[in-house]
Amino acid sequence: MPFELSVSLTTLGILAVVAFVAGFIDAIAGGGGLLTTPALLTAGMPPHLVLGTNKLSSTFGSATAGFTFYRRKLFHPRQWTHALICTAIGALVGAVVAHYLPAEWLNKMLPVIVFGCGLYLLFGGTPKAPLDVDVPIRKKWQSPQGFTLGFYDGVAGPGTGAFWTVSTLLLYPIDLVKASGVARSMNFVSNAAALMVFVINGQVDWLIGLCMGACVMIGAFFGARTAIGGGAKFIRPVFISVVLALTVRLAWQHWFGQA
């Protein structure tokens, strides 16, 4: 029996609520997979379907959030063409490599790296006010940044939004709100590219993924608008809270062998 036919309406409702909350949080600070992946596993979905199904729903959310930032003129694709292209390439390569490469060493390093991102945003000197929109964005770092983070998202995924936000703040003269717009947009590119590989390999539960995707979209819409309206003062504490939760979750899972 297909998995979706064995899911009760109550379970489906719970997954929908989790997806909405995940979309809201992910649009602000990333880390939505921290909620949706365990929820799918708890619902009894076979592990080989969880990653692909989660990518499907995440793609809807990152598309909605990214487009919201774009419409508010907080993300300009023409300034980021190198990053967009290399992110897509990296995600495709990463998703393919994920089928053959043991990721145990990477998993054990993740909590430390993610926690480092949180510490940087907590103590680092990030811009407090919006910067000039016409400041040129250097192309020099876009290709390596895009390929590296796209590859990582294809291979693993947790913390990708945090990595995008912090690395963008470090490399370019933009504020936290615009860095969040870049992160959400690049997340969409890597999600969509990696999703193609999961679809080809038949690792997506379409019914569950589309239902959750719709709820993630709604959550992402409100989350992105909240982030833009609240600015850096709102994003910073939410981002740090999500990073700390993600650190605990990853450490528990990969250091202590707990699900």
Give the ranges of each region predicted by the language model.
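Residue-level signature of the transmembrane alpha-helical core
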Residues: 16, 20, 24, 55, ...
